[in-house]
């Protein structure tokens, strides 16, 4: 799966089971700062029930509060996520890819982050610190 695909699935969890249509540009402004065109989030389709999304959010929050994503705990925002270590090729001779997918502001999600660090080890040691920097930058701007 690609980081974009994983971000989309994670956003469905964050949005109560609704898979949103991805977009890269929120708005277009003229040189004077006037909004020329803006895009609003749209539901693509329902991937899971609200109850399923809530249970996944609960489990992903546990990963951050007391599991492999705990480096994101106590940072001034809530987060939910999942780490991963993906083997590839000949697992005996390659270093695994490090993954993290998650979202912040759990009660009213703001941002989804998907990180893959190829051939770098475990998700908790490599991908979570990268995600932490992204979340921190988002909330400190």
Functional labels for PLM-detected ranges:
Residues 1-43, 51, 60-141:
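Active-site beta-strand/loop architecture of penicillin-binding DD-peptidases
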């Amino acid at each position: 799966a690609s980081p974009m695909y994983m971000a989309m699935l994670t956003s469905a969890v964050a949005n109560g089971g609704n898979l949103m249509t991805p977009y890269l540009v929120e708005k277009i402004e003229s040189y004077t700062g006037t909004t020329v065109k803006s895009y609003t989030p749209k539901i693509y389709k329902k991937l899971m029930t609200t109850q399923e999304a809530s249970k996944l959010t609960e489990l992903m929050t546990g990963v951050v509060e007391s599991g492999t994503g705990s480096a994101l705990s106590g940072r001034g925002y809530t987060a939910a996520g999942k780490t991963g270590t993906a083997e590839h090729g000949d697992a005996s001779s390659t270093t695994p890819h490090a993954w993290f997918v998650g979202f912040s502001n759990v009660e009213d999600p703001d941002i989804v982050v998907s990180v893959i660090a190829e051939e770098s080890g475990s998700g908790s040691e490599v991908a979570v610190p990268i995600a932490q920097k992204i979340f921190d930058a988002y909330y400190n701007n």
